[in-house]
Amino acid sequence: MEHEDDDENDDENECKFHFLAKPLEFESMKIGPYQIHLLETGRFWLDGGAMFGVVPKTLWSQEKPSDEKNRIEMSMKVLLILYEDRKILVDAGAGHKFPPKLQEIYGLDYQRFSLKTSLQAHRLQPVDITDVILTHCHFDHVGGATERDGEVLQLTFPKATHYVQDSHWNWALSPSEKDRASFLKENLEPLKQSGRLKILLGERELFPGLHLLLSNGHTVGLQMVKIQDSTNTLFYCSDLMPTAAHVPLPYIMGYDLYPLTTLEEKRRYLSQACDENWLIVLEHDAEVDAIRIEQGEKRLEIREKLAI
């Protein structure tokens, strides 16, 4: 496990976006030196009430209808970023280590999508991945970074450096009673023992034009990814705003440790996203890949829903 001090990189790169006419297709876009792909790793289902906190079901169900168990369908979408000789993943999905009972509880579905098959579509194997940026260590974000080989737990991406914030890693190893079910030992121990975990201290420009931004409302030390050049910005906001239905500021998950912190973080980041026309990638929305927002008469609203 390696700790790294903060540093700066002021390189700028010329770039442009490539948009598709049809929504909900997983294609690609280019920002500067980065070719960016959005990959599906699987689907799962979570309680709609928990996903929207204090917001009444009569409101959230208009956007996200629930099943007979009050669950809404969730995606687990990750970024694949190709840059020079680097092949970078942002998050890794839930993985395939769940016992049958938990698979049933969460309605895990890998029939349509999985991380490995999504990588294969880009002619990549796990051994090709050089870097894995983990926004945080909840099971649906980190589980795919490890796998079972018989009874042995090992890294899915054995040659990759895995990046986690120091404050979050410490929290993940000693979580609260409220969130400890989200941190599974089988997801953390292989990383801890691998020698391929790099602990980061705060916000930084990890690669030229690729910035890590901190959020502390959903969990302590969550790192979001912003990729930008002189013209365009992509914002992978992880669980700060998991779906398009969470654009209204008070629409905050019941899972969040510090909802008032989430409220202020959403206000700050979404205001900037609105002013600067960011493309916001939605990790958990099963129907919408990315959005741009605008200021409506009373609140921030979705201006357009986009495919990448």
Feature annotation, model-predicted:
Residues 1-27:
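Intrinsic disorder/low-complexity segments
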Residues 31-35, 42-122, 224-239:
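Conserved beta-strand hairpin/beta-sheet module of binuclear metal-dependent hydrolase folds
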Residues 41-43, 92-95, 137, 167-168, ...:
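Active-site metal-binding loops of divalent metal-dependent hydrolases
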Residues 110-124, 128-140, 156-214, 264-277:
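Metallo-beta-lactamase
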Residues 142-152, 292-294:
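Metal-dependent catalytic neighborhoods of phosphoester/phosphodiester hydrolases
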